[in-house]
């Protein structure tokens, strides 16, 4: 009961008395003992964090490639620091999931993700020469795709095993982070000037855009009880349109200006989407299953 109260107090900004009142009300409405309701909230919060962290791995797999390319195209800027922070986040999430997830149930899937990450890290740390740049980025993208697929499988397994119905919505909202970074990745790769890479990037941008916009439409159509979710969805829509506009070449604009515009729009959008995922993760619907 104390753990459940603590979760409600932290995520809903409630006092101790208000958190206990919510637990007691939920207990009466569901005809369950207070301990059962509390256990459900604790389990839901853990499942939600597991799914959110797996979802971050999906996003970070695409972010790594984008930042590596941006580092090569633009010599100055925050990209090296952002890349290092992304690597640290992947490491931290894998450590957390290794402790949180059941080894018997998820050990094989998590092990595959860890192995893929170990193979990807040398490519992230390497700096390719000018002639090998396109080939190196293509190889890095291929390895990042394996990391994405492994994280997708693990996230899907977690979603299907959870007793909380709203977890699908959390997973869908969290996946928007990956799709936005994936779209930006292809937009940046298209600037490399390699014809096959440009063709692949055009297809990737179209697919990512369609998936992102379909999910955003779905999320906007759900009944909302939290103003912060409604506000974040609106900001995500604006941020998405800004990112789309940044992919259009303005007359007279140089490559550096376009790259910087893409990078800034991408960063603003991911900040909004991270906030949106946090709102869903900590929502009362997520915690109580209502």
Task: State where each predicted segment sits.
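Hydrophobic alpha-helical segments
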Residues: 1-290
């Amino acid at each position: 009961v104390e753990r459940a109260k603590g979760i409600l107090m932290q995520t809903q900004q409630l006092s101790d008395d208000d958190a206990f009142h919510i637990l007691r009300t939920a207990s009466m409405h569901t005809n369950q003992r207070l301990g059962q309701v509390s256990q459900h909230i604790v389990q839901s919060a853990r499942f939600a964090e597991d799914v959110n962290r797996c979802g971050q791995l999906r996003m970070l797999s695409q972010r790594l490639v984008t930042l590596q390319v941006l580092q090569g195209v633009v010599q100055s800027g925050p990209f090296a620091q952002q890349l290092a922070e992304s690597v640290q986040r992947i490491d931290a999430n894998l450590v957390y999931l290794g402790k949180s997830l059941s080894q018997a149930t998820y050990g094989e899937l998590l092990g595959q993700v860890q192995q893929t990450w170990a193979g990807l890290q040398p490519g992230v740390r390497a700096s390719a020469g000018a002639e090998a740049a396109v080939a190196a980025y293509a190889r890095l993208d291929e390895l990042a795709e394996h990391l994405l697929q492994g994280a997708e499988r693990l996230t899907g397994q977690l979603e299907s095993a959870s007793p909380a119905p709203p977890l699908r919505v959390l997973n869908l909202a969290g996946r928007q982070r990956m799709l936005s970074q994936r779209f930006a990745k292809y937009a940046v790769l298209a600037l490399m000037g390699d014809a096959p890479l440009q063709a692949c990037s055009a297809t990737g941008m179209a697919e990512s855009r369609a998936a992102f916009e379909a999910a955003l439409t779905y999320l906007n159509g759900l009944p909302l009880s939290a103003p912060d979710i409604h506000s974040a969805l609106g900001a995500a829509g604006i941020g998405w349109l800004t990112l789309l506009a940044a992919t259009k070449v303005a007359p007279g604009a140089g490559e550096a200006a376009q790259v910087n515009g893409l990078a800034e729009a991408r960063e603003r959008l991911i900040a909004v989407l991270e906030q949106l995922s946090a709102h869903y993760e900590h929502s009362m619907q997520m915690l109580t299953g209502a």
